[in-house]
């Protein structure tokens, strides 16, 4: 470890952080809930050319299409109305009495209740409703194809939309809408064969999440786009505000990093110029396995982790997507009520993706800036609860494929986040593979980690 452990995290848990320890299910052939029996997509089985590629109908991939975070906040500044409702916090909800009076409803004599509120720039919006002490929690997301299998692309898109609710510990979604753009560059045969598969994948993932797709919007566009809106009405005790991290908490991550690297490397198999830059550090078979692992991880719902956030008293969380683990950590740190900062020591990464990132000179994976799509939850947990969370999430009662690693600590600070100079890379082996005989320097294989 290149830097000394911060004070206040506790000796026992810091030992786990320093060792790069975590929890994951044993390597095996199970594909996880919803993926058993999966067969790789073959275009020719649908009567399409073997060279047909879903990713050929867009110029960007997945959550890599996001506007840079600083630019985004500037663009959205005009939407913020602090006089009505603070962007984050637990302030009084202004205007509720006036709205009730206008509607002819009785107004209580006592002061307005205090409701949790979230607004622009965060994972989900939390809007207090006028009746019954309930809140509307809503999120929307969409992106472009990043895998070739249209069914799995639909699942990934739905999982990504729901993940913003899961980041708040919400496990139930009342309704989903689907947003779909069909490429004008597709011939009619392609549209008729591919589009239903994307829709089915989205619908199946929604059903796995206990919700349903009841509408949406479908348009023609040069690029394929898929995403949606997730909505739930709930009581304040059903969600966890992302603002209560305390000194001594530890950071837990529930999916490995490297999805964007994996899907790009998979496309480079057919691009000699790109492939020549990485072929000395990875084999074609390793790229195929990493791509499949990335696809299954992206399509896995964060619902189990969301439920366990309540069980183990999580203080805050976010999901890791287009801004990378560092960008989302920084955004989460800014929302904290206490004067804390996040320090990341360990980076669980799909095996060989760190080497590809270095060899290609792209992505910024070890710097934490590489985009992820439908990534895991980064959760602030009490020190004494983190190990139990990691152990519980891999229980067979939740299905195969769930993982978690302790990746950092919460220390006293000024609401910032950083990755240490030489983070420990945890090589996460694709399911169905055996542990490597020798892990690279400054890394550890994770087939059977212990706490």
UniProtKB/Swiss-Prot annotation:
Specify the signal sequence span: none
Any idea which positions bind Mg(2+)? 123, 164, 319
Give residue numbers for the site Important for catalytic activity: 66
EC id:
2.7.9.3
Assigned keywords, A-Z: Acetylation, ATP-binding, Kinase, Magnesium, Metal-binding, Nucleotide-binding, Phosphoprotein, Selenium, Selenocysteine, Transferase, Ubl conjugation
Q: Which residues form the active site?
A: 63
Briefly state the modifications made to the protein after translation: Truncated SEPHS2 proteins produced by failed UGA/Sec decoding are ubiquitinated by the CRL2(KLHDC3) complex, which recognizes the glycine (Gly) at the C-terminus of truncated SEPHS2 proteins.
Pfam families the record matches = AIRS (PF00586), AIRS_C (PF02769)
Task: Supply one GO molecular-function term.
Answer: ATP binding
Task: Tell me the residue numbers annotated for binding ATP.
Answer: 66, 121-123, 141, 164, 215-218
Primary role: Synthesizes selenophosphate from selenide and ATP.
Protein name per the record: Selenide, water dikinase 2
Q: Which species?
A: Sus scrofa
The gene designation is: SEPHS2
